[in-house]
Regions:
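Long, low-complexity segments enriched in small/aliphatic residues
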Residues: 371-443
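Alpha-helical structural elements
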Residues: 34, 43, 67, 319, ...
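Intrinsically disordered, low-complexity segments enriched in small/polar residues
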Residues: 44, 58, 277, 362, ...
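N-terminal export/assembly segments and adjacent metallocofactor-ligating motifs
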Residues: 1-205, 221, 354, 411-443
């Protein structure tokens, strides 16, 4: 029995991991009033079979179009040879712990390259924590009298947060939505589906709302368009006008931690297009074009591994200690419940070994030493289980274009490599699809 953190969404629900031998047998919720109370989303509870299937358990090297097993020394030597003197870019995936994102940033920037964790193109300013995390805590929802949702479907993006919103609604909270009309299990006022409704709302006077607690929740689908920065600026403007608090609802468990660690670059996604070598740390949702040499480090044989020229097998979230910062900016520790299969290693350790192979050895030999270096750069990460107060810095950005907001999570049950490896999640996804098609046919 190991106390840990769930990574299926960015809420950071506290869980207990029960293992038998090497295998995870079940996940149970742990009580944390500030995050998930005593609840856990069904997906988080039943995704354990995905940790057993399609695992990467040894390094692979692609030769003549086919992947062949390799030893660690050979794989690391090949990786270092491929990276030396080349234009390198790094991608940080959604499930990467903060330490691994920080180590990758040091490795790639040491080779003159750039690193990016905002792989979905979200226009989140990396130097403004009040804009990429917000100022609200999850507990603030409990006391809110008004809640505005912008471009988000919390039922898919963070089901336990949605349950908390429902609890507030039952106590009299009025909820309004700008975005696609979805079933949230409670009533809300639908203001419109896109930017026009947001612009109209921005011009509102908000009389009585100013005197009572309110919260504005912004989803990732609102921030991934070309005008994502303008949408964020509008949301912050509405938050100011209502004397409310802002919560950026992330859909990736590792995103806030990676941004805190500095794994961003304003020109990174353009650099990825022109890079000769791409180091992919579990970013399976990114389509990488033919051309660049791809090194994939991750736990599952998912999309990223299929495109890779070298595969370095890493541990999953239950198989290594890791720091995850949740959507409200709360650093939490995920503890190791079991060991990675076969020859798979901890993610930070792979990057440390590769740094030595490249002749630019990191100044740490253990996870504890890495954390000391990380905390020296980002002091608030030492405050485990505390939500730092972020200084409010409004974003000044361009004009809103016209158009509707989309969905950040299109298939709830298959949103990451672990879920896609799960037979149960595949079955649930198929059932959900059949249900939605039946509803459309009935209409």
């Amino acid at each position: 029995k190991t106390e840990s953190i769930d990574v299926m969404d960015a809420l950071g629900s506290n869980v207990r991991v029960d293992t038998k031998g090497r295998e995870v047998m079940r996940f149970l919720p742990r009580n944390h009033d500030g995050v998930n109370e005593e609840w856990l989303a069904d997906k988080s509870r039943f995704v354990w079979d995905g940790l057993r299937r399609q695992r990467l358990d040894r390094p692979y090297i692609r030769e003549n179009g086919k992947l062949r097993p390799a030893s660690w020394p050979e794989a690391l030597a090949k990786t270092a040879a491929a990276m030396k003197g080349k234009q390198v870019a790094g991608l940080v995936g959604d499930l990467a712990p903060t330490e691994a994102a920080f180590a990758l940033k040091q490795l790639i920037e040491g080779q003159g390259g750039v690193v990016e964790c905002r792989t979905d193109g979200a226009k989140l300013p990396s130097d403004n924590r009040s804009a990429y995390v917000g100022t609200a805590t999850i507990e603030d929802i409990d006391d809110a009298k008004y809640a505005l949702l912008i471009g988000t479907n919390p039922r898919n993006e963070a089901p336990v947060l949605n349950a908390r919103l429902r609890k507030a609604w039952l106590k009299g909270c009025e909820v309004a939505m700008v975005g696609q009309a979805v079933d949230l299990t409670f009533d809300y006022t639908h203001m419109g589906t896109g930017r026009d409704a947001l612009a109209k709302l921005q011009g509102h006077s908000f009389g009585a709302i100013k005197d009572v607690p309110s919260v504005v929740i912004v989803g990732q689908s609102a921030l991934t368009g070309e005008d994502g920065a303008a949408v964020l600026a509008a949301a912050m403007d509405i938050t100011e006008k209502t004397n409310g608090k802002l919560l950026i609802l992330h859909s990736a468990a590792g995103r806030v931690g990676a941004m805190d660690a500095g794994a961003t670059n304003p020109d990174a996604m353009n650099a990825v297009q022109s890079a000769e070598v791409i180091y992919n740390l579990g970013a399976d949702e990114v389509e990488i074009a033919d051309g660049p040499f791809v090194i994939y480090q991750g736990s599952h044989g998912d999309r990223g591994a299929h495109r890779a020229d070298i595969i370095l097998p890493g541990a999953a979230y239950t198989e290594e200690q890791g720091l995850f910062v949740n959507t409200e900016g709360r650093p939490q520790l995920a503890l190791r419940a079991g060991f990675a299969p076969g020859e798979a290693k901890e993610n930070w350790a792979i990057l440390r070994a590769l740094s030595a192979e490249l002749g630019a050895t990191f100044p740490y030999d253990s996870l504890a030493q890495l954390r000391q270096v990380l905390v020296a750069e980002v002091p608030h990460l030492a405050q485990i289980d505390e939500v730092p107060e972020n200084a409010w810095v409004p974003v000044q950005a361009g004009k809103l274009v016209s158009g509707d907001f989309g969905q950040a999570v299109t298939d709830y049950y298959l949103s990451n490599p672990i879920a896609r490896a799960s037979t149960l999640m595949a079955e649930l996804s198929a059932n959900a699809k059949a249900r939605s098609e039946t509803l459309i046919a009935a209409e």
